[in-house]
């Protein structure tokens, strides 16, 4: 049986729009994610 196509098709603009910093700062939950990652000491906060 044939397998499906590869689902990860890299695209930097889409990556930023879907997981980026400005998107995270837009909602309360997103800001919570960024602050949690800061608290944990993550080197990268968002995409």
Swiss-Prot record:
Record GO cellular component, one term: ribonucleoprotein complex
Keyword Transferase found: no
Organism listed in the record: Nocardia farcinica (strain IFM 10152)
Family according to the record: Belongs to the bacterial ribosomal protein bL34 family.
GO biological process: translation
Pfam families in the record: Ribosomal_L34
Keywords: Ribonucleoprotein, Ribosomal protein
UniProt name for this protein: Large ribosomal subunit protein bL34
GO MF assignments: structural constituent of ribosome
Keyword Iron attributed: no
Gene: rpmH
Domain of life where this protein originates: Bacteria
InterPro entries registered for this protein in UniProt: Ribosomal_bL34, Ribosomal_bL34_CS
């Amino acid at each position: 049986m044939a397998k499906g196509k590869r689902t990860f098709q890299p695209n930097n603009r889409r990556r930023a729009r879907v997981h980026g910093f400005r998107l995270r700062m837009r909602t309360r939950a997103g800001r919570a994610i960024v602050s949690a990652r800061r608290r944990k000491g993550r080197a990268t906060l968002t995409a």
